[in-house]
Amino acid sequence: MENVGTEISTVSREEVLPVLATAKIARPRAAALAARPARPRPARRRFPARTLHLVDIENLAGAAIPSPGQVSEVQGRYVTSPGFGADDLVVMAASHLGLLNVALGWPHARYRVRSGPDGADLELLDVLWHEDVAARFTHVVIGSGDGVFGQAAANLSERGVRVTVVSRRDSLATSLARVAMDVVYLDTSQAAAA
């Protein structure tokens, strides 16, 4: 057999790409989609809009071991200040000595326990640093006035999370107030823009 008229030639990639780019390929679905008016798409989030409340009850109550009555009083003020939604998550932190009082005074929360200096703060920071809060929540309320939360709050703000601080007026660190979008004082129940 004789190979009549068959000649193999090499074509470079640079020669093929312009031809492919201008070639019209029949794509009925693509044409239908292109003809449809463009709608603005909301940013896709993996989780629905939710709020995380991180509560250092010892700081808000102003006591190392708050009584159930003090915890209930703080809860009453706190719940009316930033407002709660049905899907909000409350994480409370306290020492092992105050855990029972906290659970009795503010039921239906997730409790974290650590004793020692700044134990409650460290537990709440552990939640912020290790639980991908920015991907799961659109709003974080920090129930503490301790400045140790300043860096974590700034990181959340940079990632598009709204940060609110709930604190007693006399225990709010300036560094934390600066990075928060909103500040709510429990003792006066007035919000001040930070």
PLM features: residue spans?
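Nuclease catalytic cores that cleave nucleic-acid phosphodiester bonds
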Residues: 96-194
